């Protein structure tokens, strides 16, 4: 999944940077409480100062005003700003950013369904900074894409499946 995120972020960055008009592209990546997958987006950088310029993880509090200031400051050196955010970014009070604009439902386990922080930030950037903004939600593809599957991943998946079937046949739960 990390390889997929890094590669996809790189491709989105290349697309975002073909225009000379100021723009912000916000990429929303899985990660309710752990930001390792979003952190993998840093691997998309080819040099210091390359996009994604800003990466936000759920392990730290997210401040909307500080975010806007950093995006605005990034335009001093870059015409196009790519931002990667974990779906679970939250403010200092623990409120998920995706809840700012909508009532998040709950899944079958009672967890809040997190989606939409990218869209919220896209609208915020557009209205407050007056620049072109768009958001991309990697969503299901980052979890199920086999395009970047490594041989080791495949072997471990087969072994885990075999172990699970054997445990079930032995009556283990």
Q: Model-found features: residue ranges?
A:
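C-terminal catalytic subdomain
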Residues: 101-173
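Accessory alpha-helical/coil subdomains and C-terminal extensions
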Residues: 1-134
């Amino acid at each position: 999944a990390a390889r997929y995120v890094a590669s996809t972020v790189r491709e989105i960055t290349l697309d975002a940077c073909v225009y000379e008009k100021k723009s912000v592209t916000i990429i929303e990546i899985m990660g309710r409480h752990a930001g390792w997958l979003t952190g993998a987006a840093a691997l998309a950088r080819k040099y210091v100062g390359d996009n994604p310029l800003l990466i936000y993880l759920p392990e730290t509090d997210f401040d909307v005003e500080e975010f806007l200031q950093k995006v605005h400051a990034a335009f001093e050196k870059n015409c196009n700003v790519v931002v990667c955010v974990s779906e679970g970014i939250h403010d200092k009070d623990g409120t998920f950013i995706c809840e700012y604009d909508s009532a998040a439902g709950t899944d079958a386990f009672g967890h809040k369904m997190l989606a939409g922080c990218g869209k919220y930030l896209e609208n915020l950037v557009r209205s407050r900074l007056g620049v072109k903004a768009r958001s991309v939600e990697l969503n299901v593809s980052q979890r199920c894409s086999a395009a970047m599957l490594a041989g080791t991943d495949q072997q471990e998946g087969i072994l885990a499946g075999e172990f699970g079937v054997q445990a079930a046949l032995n009556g283990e739960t």
